Amino acid sequence: MVWRQLEVTKAHVAYSCLGIFSSIFSLVSLFVKERLYIGESMVASVFGLIVGPHCLNWFNPLSWGNTDSITLEISRILLCLQVFAVSVELPRKYMQKHWLSVTMLLVPVMTSGWLVIALFVWILVPGLNFPASLLMGACITATDPVLAQSVVSGTFAQKVPGHLRNLLSCESGCNDGLAFPFVFLSIDLLLYPGRGGEIVKDWICVTILWECIFGSILGCIIGYCGRKAIRFAEGKRIIDRESFLAFYLILALTCAGFGSMLGVDDLLVSFFAGTAFAWDGWFATKTHESNVSNVIDVLLNYAYFVYLGSILPWKDFNNADIGLDVWRLIILSLVVIFLRRIPAVLLLKPLIPDIKSWREAMFIGHFGPIGVGAVYAAIMSKSQLESHLTDEETPLNYTPGKGSKHWQAMACLWPITCFSIITSVIVHGSSVAVIMLGRYLNTVTLTAAPTSRTASTSTKNSWLQSLPPFDKSGRPFSLQRLDKETSPTPGQIDVRTSGMIAAPALGMRQRWRQKLHGNKETESDIEMSDLQRQREEHTGTIDLNDTTTETLGTTNARTPGLAQRSKVNIMNRTETVNTIYGLDKLADDTENHDVYHVETSRVHDIGSSHDDVYTYEFDADSIDSLERERIKLLREPEQQAYIAYTEDNQVIIENRQGEILEYARSHNDGVRDAEAGSHNQGRHKRASSPPLERLRQITNEACKTKYYAYKVGNDLIVEDESGEEFRRYRISPHGGKRKIKKKKINNPVPERKNHSLLHSEDEMADDEAESEEENYGDSDDLALFVKDHAD
């Protein structure tokens, strides 16, 4: 007789198994992901196999009841939550700006993959007709948003360019819902053979118009109403922080419920609801520092893949009665990995603006994971076929026996889908592809941070302190490049500039603003000069004001005369990028461009004519001033350069959201051209700023790794290790202090009251409750920081 306190149920064992796995894996998750390059989905599936009915039989969902029905609803909830989260985390108005790239991946690429998989299933599996093969292909065509998180978020994502992360994230969130037309067209072809009119009527009227189009409209309505409701509640201060963070989860469940009740595509409902909910970027800004969604996603992923690993039909993988053999499934898996997406993406690469190189096209084509979406599509398809055979509630807990109508299609559907998922989890669940891509990309992170130079607190003696301090007194000086007489090396540009630093509050930025209307070509230079500090970035940065041996070495820049070699700053590639970028921007005179051979274009200009919400040509009485201030604060971070990376002969500069700010390509003959994405409605070419070209040269792995900087009198000199002068700047202080007059400028663009656009994420989030004076404080000088990700 067992002690009655030890009456263990199946649910208790399931809780314990999930808890033990989640606890152990969480403790070693960083090691497994970064050292072993294995994702949590693979480890969870293996654990589910071990504790499942095929091994230890501790965790057996097959004994819980109708397994297909349980799996269908779990998959539905997980997908709706993940799809909604993906659409919320996209940059604001992403679908409007990148609709062509997303459409090319959703329509021609998915159609190609669907037909290719169907063809090989029809060839490899004996007894299946072509409509049944089309159904198999439709279930495993879409990419999975859950498995895609391994490349679009987390540590691995830092090795992938932001525009690729956004593209993969958007595609994975949208194409699960767009798999419905392929699935139901295959079902109609299977159920109504030879009845073309019935097929067309059912597919167009029911699937396309009702399930997809009406479902998308329903999602937009839910998202729009949710956005207005939460903004009203937050404005009235009647919602607490916890409910505010959980609101998007509530909306995702609402989409799943209404979508299922109305018989529409609930995944499309969730995606478009999330897109409409986060359309203006307000919610994403408010919850930027919160990790609630990530925590929930991790817990759901752990539990789901343990569950999935325990219910995989291992016996059916080698079941000759239904026409399946292991070798057939292995060949089919190779076809799925290599022919499902890669050929179509490579072929359409010139038509996809967000794919900038063949390597990126190869990566986008390769990374098409199959996971939860395929499970959902397979069980839903099986349920639809079973509903035409029986009056019982579907999906059934068993597969109809041999001899019943469409029995082989229903019997093969689940094993083929599961084997494809296993292959995808092994191939895409690891991050080797991401690591290999990052190995070829030379990335430089650009951030800005305020530093203070006071006699009482600053003990550092950096050579950059040889520049006059940018104090609040507004003491002016000019910085002039003197290396104009040196012959440019191949791939180098010759720029002769001079400039003047004025008062921080209404100095250089005001002068730039005034010249903006007379010289439109300098707009990108102005935007690139505002490098925004990102406080949540936890990676190390290099401070040019730091004179330790780890950064710039020892120096005595104040010593007049020729600097001794021991007093010279020895800089690596990263520090040289930082120095050249910062000093060239200081020395840049917008009225004296003498740039040859380089031409770039602004790929996306925030607030351009097609973005009518963010243009400032409006009546001041029509829009509240707080709303205009909020819009301005949203636009500013999007115009700040965050990361630059080079690949082959091109350099790409992105903001923190992954939107491409500048994209330049250099050819061997010295002539460079620029390419713009399709979302830019006109190519406005301009002369490239020197830092853009310098980033391409210095981040090149073939360039020299050591540079020397020293001061001779009023000259700052930068040399490479061979002794060739790389840059020379002359500092010309101007006596006296300038008196600054504040005057009102009739400019439709609200005037910034500070030279530095430094503000925290919390200030951006609460922009409607704070005035402009609170958002921008007095600025000290601006120090550039650079983090090199190339190594």
From Swiss-Prot:
Annotated compartments: Membrane
GO terms of biological process kind: intracellular potassium ion homeostasis; proton export across plasma membrane; regulation of membrane potential; sodium ion export across plasma membrane
Composition bias, Acidic residues: 763-781
Membrane topology term: Multi-pass membrane protein
Keyword Transport: yes
Region (Disordered): 670-694, 729-791
Coiled-coil segments on the chain, per record: none
Keyword flag Flavoprotein: no
Annotated glycan sites: N291, N545, N572, N754
Family annotation (InterPro entries): Cation/H_antiporter_C, Cation/H_exchanger_TM, Na+/H+_antiporter_fungi, Na+/solute_symporter_sf, Nha1
Organism domain of life: Eukaryota
Family affiliation: Belongs to the fungal Na(+)/H(+) exchanger family.
Protein name: Na(+)/H(+) antiporter 1
Originating organism: Zygosaccharomyces rouxii
Source lineage: Eukaryota, Fungi, Dikarya, Ascomycota, Saccharomycotina
Gene: SOD2
